[in-house]
Every structure is written in structure tokens, then in C-alpha cells.
């Protein structure tokens, strides 16, 4: 019956059926599996988080699938907590971010070490105006576990002390001299400190290692603001060619 209800797009009815069945057979693997499916359809992330330990204990789904589900569950719960903080801050701009930070502390260790979960949490913090806390988190993680994904975000976030933030990132360059993502972040952090020449140098070095739309756009924008319109337009054209994968074809000379 529960299967038919799920197949018939009636997840609420299926859930009611399955909860009755679970009272009779609390550990039945098939009931647990269908419960998981019902909660997923209903996007009831909190109940799913409570169900996961039982799914793991009974080996209802493969471990790799369960780990991926757990990441998905906590990611959605973090987003819900951030939305709650956003609503609170509309009423009171000084409202704390406790719903979000408390939930972060609840995360299982392996989820809290996942670079994409860290990235999402840092983005949520920054989006709620706490860039300083986001920068501190990213700095601590990057010191011990390098991630190109996280260094990109680190370059976008303004910490409490932009000068110190740049100096810290420059220390990382000693061991990663040819990392284009780090060089892009350093260019952005140099801009934050109004070090225009240094920023351009970092962007240019990054581009030599990897032609990337994001870096082309940053260097083009900087050149435009430094009065170098021709160089800016040339870079924009290169960025468009990169975007659309244009073939290398002869062109008329200006």
C-alpha cells in the first residue's frame, strides 16, 4: 500500500502508512527504506537526519549512498537554518546566528570535514554578514587541508583584517607557487588592500598557468579601471572565446 501511495505521488499518505508499520516492525529494512523515500519526497530533512543512524545500523542502503544522503540532508538543514536567521535579522538586525552555528556543531565529523559542506557553510555565514567568521573557518581548514574550491571562496570573502588575510594567503604560495586558483585569490585579496599593481601581477601569473574565464574577467575589470581600455577589451574577447569554445580561425587585421 505504501509503495502504491508513493508511486501515486501521495507521499503524505505513504508516510502515515509507513509510520503505522514501523510501530509494528520498528527495524524492518524494507519499511525503513520506504520511510527514507517518503521523507525525501517530502523534503523532511530533520526526520531524515533522525532516520539515518537506523538506516546505517540495519545496512538498509550501501554506505556510500548513505554518506551522500547524509551530506544532502545536512546541507539542506544548514540552508533552512540560514533562512531562519535571515527572517530573524529582518525583524532584528542584531539577531544572532545561533540557529546556524548550533546546527554546524551538530554535524557528524565526516560531514563537517567535507570541503563542499564547509564551502556552503562559509557562504551562508558570509551571506548573513558574518564574513569574519567565514574567513576564520576557511583559514583554519586551508592550513591543514588544501582545497582549490575553498581558496577560491577565501579570495572572495573579506575578513576582519584584509592585510593579514593577504599575508596569510601569501604564506601558502611558498608551497604552491604554480596554483592558479591561489594566485586568483591573491589577486582579489590584493585588490581588497588596494594594491593594484600586485593584483595585476597575480592575475597575469594565474592566467599563464590556466586560461580561466573568472581570472580573465578580473584582469579585464582591473585594466579598465586603470585606464587601459584596449587591454581590457582584448581580455573580454578572450573570455568570450573561452566561454563559447570558438575554434582558432583566421581574422581580418585591424
Task: List PLM regions with ranges.
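Structural register within alpha-helical repeat arrays
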Residues: 1, 35, 77-81, 120-121, ...
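Alpha-helical adaptor scaffolds
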Residues: 2-6, 136-208
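Structural motif corresponding to the intra-repeat A-B loop/turn of tetratricopeptide repeats
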Residues: 8, 42, 94, 127-128, ...
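TPR alpha-solenoid repeat register
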Residues: 31, 65, 117, 150-151, ...
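TPR/TPR-like (Sel1-like) alpha-helical repeat modules
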Residues: 23-24, 36-61, 135-148, 207-213, ...
